[in-house]
Amino acid sequence: MSVHGRFPASPPISLSPSSSSTSPSSQSPSTPPDLKQRVIACLNKLADRDTLALASAELDSIARNLTHDSFSPFLNCIHNTDSSVKSPVRKQCVALLSVLSRYHGDSLTPHLAKMVSTVIRRLRDPDSSVRSACAVATADMSAHVTRQPFASVAKPLIETLIQEGDSNLQIGAALCLAASVDAATDPESEQLRKSLPKIGKLLKSDGFKAKAALLSAVGSIITAGGAGTKPVLDWLVPVLIEFLSSEDWAARKSAAEALGKVATAEDLASQYKKTCTTALESRRFDKVKSVRETMNRALNLWKEVSTDDEASLSPSRSSTDDGNIGCFSSVTRSSTIDVGLKSARPKKVTPIMKRSPSLPVNRSYAATRQKENLPKRNQGNMTMLVEEASSVDNKGPHFTPVKKSSEETEEKANSGGPDIIKHTISEKSREDSKVSSFGGLRSGSRVAPCSDDGDSVKNCKDDVEESKKDSEELSLIREQLALIENQQSSLLDLLQKFMGTSQSGIQSLESRVSGLEMALDEISCDLAVSNGRVPRNSSGCAGDSCSKLPGTEFLSPKFWRKTEERPRNRNTANEMAAYDQGMRESTDTNNGQRGGSVFQKRSRRDQFQDCMHTTLQKPTTRLST
């Protein structure tokens, strides 16, 4: 096959003049003289299904074995391939860029702009597989060609997003931007942060059609640290929340993914926890399964974010202050916060001084506890214990070992051990009155440190969290039940309305049918009177008959249908004779027995209608119901 051969059932490969003419540098010994012929021949084979696999393997082999001098002619052959060729050819040309990036890496740095322009040229392709190959090629270039700054790849893609209006190109550029940011080793977050306002304008623009793909790119930028400042998050988070209610399910899914990345990647996420959690809670029951799962994952990520209020409620682990006695400064601060969290379950109390039982303060503390627990009849023993305690208190610097022990306990707590909750027992007036009589320490309060087992506190916090989760689940269940109740009530209203409409329709139909029957009787009577067959004062059509039929005022023109007038036929002799005989019998009977019963009148009317039935077998006009 020649160089300018044609694809089977497809236009030929077109090359620009610059690519068809061989430069002196391309004729170096390291470049085969038939490189272009081999590449174009393989591209021609790609259009044939039988030779597709063989041509793809050969092109990959050529791309892997290229030298520095052969990069330029090879890229020219790929770049100048006509866009009217078959889809496998276009896809393979882009895939070759991925092969080049993976095998040659930074050697392609001088040709990176050419490769990016080749990718952008293929982004208009209507075939989604070609655009996906462009995204893969962009990711490989961003990951393996690292000597050039990341802006050399991202900037052309962002400019393409802003300037172009083709929907396929917008989708492809957004996918390539997201792939390049995810694959880059140094995505230059500062440059991405500067480009976010432009992307935000595109998201708000009605003319931009690839909003779902662009939201995916925004999520990648957030992961790379491009939204790490409060001004950016102040406008970005409301935009993402707005897209949660979009009509496009892909946009809803991408917005939920971006919100989840804000929760995991940004340090300022705690300031937006309430807003984002509320928005995701209201949209978590989406009709599309994949969107619903994405929103639930994002909601769980936001629930794990700790707010500033929750951080302030954590146990204080600061060092001691100069204005307090030894280790008990932390006792006073932490007890006011955490003592309310203790449950009524039994606890294992282990005093801090239990580690050094020979300390004198331990005797003082034990004596004080025994003094409080003794009954009143042992006042003498209590006095001795208090004297011993007061004498021990005056012995000197006995708080030093206690402080050391407490500091060791605090170091253990700060190093990851269980939290120690300390409690202060203040009995100023009682201790002053009892200790002053013996000349003891007039401190005004007795501070007794006690350590609590960390399991009880942990269990208490777990119970609080479980109760919060249970309350949230109960509120959701109540909302669901209320929604179901509203739906059932609306369905019941619709059913009642339908039943009422059906009943009124049936009644209307019955009235119309009865009206038609009365109209038919009236017409038959009028016809008989007009022909002179029945006297006007006969009981069959008289106004004083007990079985008088309603007049024609009940009729409406909508009951009738105009038909073509037919010629009036004469009645046969037999029909006229039968009619005359019936009329005479009816007239004689009505004149002789006018005061008969209602039953007799109804029978006469039936006889009259039977007589008229024979006459009206061929009516002059058609009556339609």
From Swiss-Prot:
- PTM Phosphoserine: list the residues: 475
Alphabetically, the GO molecular function entries are: microtubule binding
Q: Say if the entry is tagged with keyword S-adenosyl-L-methionine.
A: no
**Which cysteines form disulfides?**
none
Give the HEAT repeat ranges: 69-106, 110-147, 149-186, 190-227, 230-268
Locations of Low complexity compositional bias?
12-29
The reply to whether Glycoprotein figures as a keyword in the UniProt entry is: no
Where does the record place the region Disordered? 1-34, 391-466, 582-625
Q: Where is the composition biased (Basic and acidic residues)?
A: 404-413, 420-434, 455-466
State the source organism's domain of life: Eukaryota
- Biased segments, Polar residues type: 612-625
Assigned keywords, A-Z: Phosphoprotein, Repeat
Database matches in Pfam families = TOR1L1_N
Name one cellular component (GO) term: microtubule
**Gene3D superfamilies registered for this protein in UniProt:** Leucine-rich Repeat Variant (1.25.10.10)
Sorted alphabetically, which PANTHER family does this protein's record hold?
A: MICROTUBULE-ASSOCIATED PROTEIN TORTIFOLIA1, TORTIFOLIA1-LIKE PROTEIN 4
The name under which this protein is listed is TORTIFOLIA1-like protein 4
Recorded source organism is Arabidopsis thaliana
Q: What is the lineage of its organism?
A: Eukaryota, Viridiplantae, Streptophyta, Embryophyta, Tracheophyta
Q: Gene symbol?
A: TOR1L4
